[in-house]
């Protein structure tokens, strides 16, 4: 943090007796604690944060046109520009965050709430402070998982098969994809999920994240990136990759039942259907129905915009590898810019050449332009869905819909 609140602010809060009311310096209502370096109530802290994050101060206009409206218990909602200016004049900055201290009873309550069973590499750690607006927060420590993924990406714990080293980029991508999919259970051997606790979802994610890292290093151009670039690339694409691969596998396995019964192979072992749901209660205080509604639009688009084209096209494994590789480089390029965009353009050109060779040599198909257009339509539809979901997650983060922060903040940004 670039600065800290004055000692008088801190001491006045900590020395206040239960009978003393500490007032918000912005509006003079009862203060909650020190927010952004200023003793303030929750409402003013929330107002300031929303204004800064959404850059609303650029849209605000003074109600009276004089920039001197009163901001107090009666008038704080009347002029947003004057309220924001008063916050700034008092010393509020986004970097200057000092959270109010917790009482012993709240600390005990937090410990009880966080005695959640730990799952694999996802460890819940109580925070010693409060997050914005005074909501209790928990850190999901994924440092051991990050280390595991980086080891794979940097070739320390996973070696390419000798067969894969002799293949072109597209063949190697298909080889790695088929290797993963060979573990897929048939429907009769899958566990049908009624309610899936979110911590079990994280277990599924962990296995898939490691597999996706293994898939990525089959691409020679990816292996040329430096260690930091590899990890940033992975974080940008893994959730999109997982979602698209699982959906295409579901269409391949269940056909039209993906639409009629909402069958979805969320993992190689677990099957979700129309009445299945995810229990988010460990990471949010919102009802599950509210969280589901937040993702309803992008989930609906996944089913309605991709299911039919995938069923009609019935892509081969090499075409699926082509789409996954295209998507990965395009999305990573958009996120990382610079060098990755340039490499991605070259990769996509080489992919097109590899796919051309495959069509001509393996399928004896000379006229494939129409099929290629349909493949790219699916790629573009998935890319749009991914970006929309990313925006949804950003809004969820801004308004603190979840009470868990990840130790690696942007790994779950979509």
Curated annotation (Swiss-Prot):
Stretches annotated zinc finger (NR C4-type): 24-44, 62-82
PROSITE patterns: NR_LBD, NUCLEAR_REC_DBD_2
Coiled-coil regions, chain positions: none
SUPFAM superfamilies the UniProt entry points to: Glucocorticoid receptor-like (DNA-binding domain), Nuclear receptor ligand-binding domain
Record Pfam families: Hormone_recep, zf-C4
Cellular-component GO terms for this entry: nucleus
Gene Ontology MF: a single term: RNA polymerase II cis-regulatory region sequence-specific DNA binding
Keywords, ordered alphabetically: DNA-binding, Metal-binding, Nucleus, Receptor, Transcription, Transcription regulation, Zinc, Zinc-finger
Origin: domain of life: Eukaryota
Membrane-spanning segments: none
NR LBD domain boundaries: 162-414
InterPro entries, per the entry: C.elegans_Orphan_NR (IPR051152), HNF4-like_DBD (IPR049636), NHR-like_dom_sf (IPR035500), Nucl_hrmn_rcpt_lig-bd (IPR000536), Znf_hrmn_rcpt (IPR001628), Znf_NHR/GATA (IPR013088)
Disulfide bonds: none
DNA-binding region coordinates: 21-99
Subcellular location: Nucleus
Classification via CDD domains: NR_DBD_HNF4A
Reported function: Orphan nuclear receptor.
Family: Belongs to the nuclear hormone receptor family.
Protein name: Nuclear hormone receptor family member nhr-213
């Amino acid at each position: 943090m670039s600065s800290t609140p004055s000692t008088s602010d801190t001491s006045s809060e900590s020395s206040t007796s239960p009978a003393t009311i500490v007032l918000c310096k912005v509006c003079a209502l009862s203060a909650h604690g020190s927010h952004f370096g200023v003793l303030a109530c929750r409402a003013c802290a929330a107002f300031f944060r929303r204004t800064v994050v959404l850059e609303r101060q650029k849209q605000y206009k003074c109600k009276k046109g004089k920039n001197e409206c009163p901001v107090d218990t009666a008038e704080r909602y009347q002029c947003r520009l004057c309220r924001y200016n008063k916050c700034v004049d008092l010393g509020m900055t986004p970097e200057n965050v000092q959270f109010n201290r917790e009482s012993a009873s709240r600390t005990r309550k937090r410990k009880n709430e966080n005695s959640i069973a730990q799952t694999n590499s996802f460890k819940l750690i109580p925070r010693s402070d409060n997050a914005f607006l005074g909501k209790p927060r928990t850190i999901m420590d994924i440092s051991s998982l990050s280390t595991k993924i980086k080891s794979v990406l940097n070739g320390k714990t996973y070696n390419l098969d000798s067969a894969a080293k002799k293949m072109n980029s597209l063949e190697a991508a298909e080889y790695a994809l088929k290797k993963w999919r060979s573990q897929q259970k048939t429907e009769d051997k899958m566990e049908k999920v009624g309610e899936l606790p979110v911590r079990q979802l994280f277990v599924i994610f962990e296995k898939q994240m490691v597999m996706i890292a293994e898939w990525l290093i089959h691409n020679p151009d990816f292996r040329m990136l430096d260690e930091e670039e590899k990890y940033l690339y992975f974080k940008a694409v893994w959730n999109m990759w997982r979602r698209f691969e699982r959906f295409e596998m579901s269409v391949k396995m269940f056909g039209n039942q993906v639409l009629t019964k909402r069958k979805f192979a969320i993992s190689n072992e677990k099957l979700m259907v129309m009445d299945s749901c995810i229990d988010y209660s460990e990471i949010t205080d919102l009802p599950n129905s509210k969280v589901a509604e937040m993702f309803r639009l992008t989930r609906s688009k996944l089913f309605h915009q991709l299911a039919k084209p995938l069923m009609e096209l019935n892509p081969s494994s090499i075409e699926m590898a082509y789409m996954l590789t295209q998507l990965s480089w395009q999305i990573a390029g958009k996120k990382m810019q610079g060098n990755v965009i340039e490499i991605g353009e070259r990769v996509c050109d080489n992919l097109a050449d590899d796919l051309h060779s495959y069509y001509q040599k393996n399928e004896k198909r000379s006229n494939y332009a129409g099929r290629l257009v349909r493949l790219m339509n699916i790629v573009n539809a998935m890319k749009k869905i991914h970006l929309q979901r990313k925006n949804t997650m950003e809004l969820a983060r801004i308004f603190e819909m979840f009470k868990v922060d990840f130790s690696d903040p942007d790994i779950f940004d979509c």
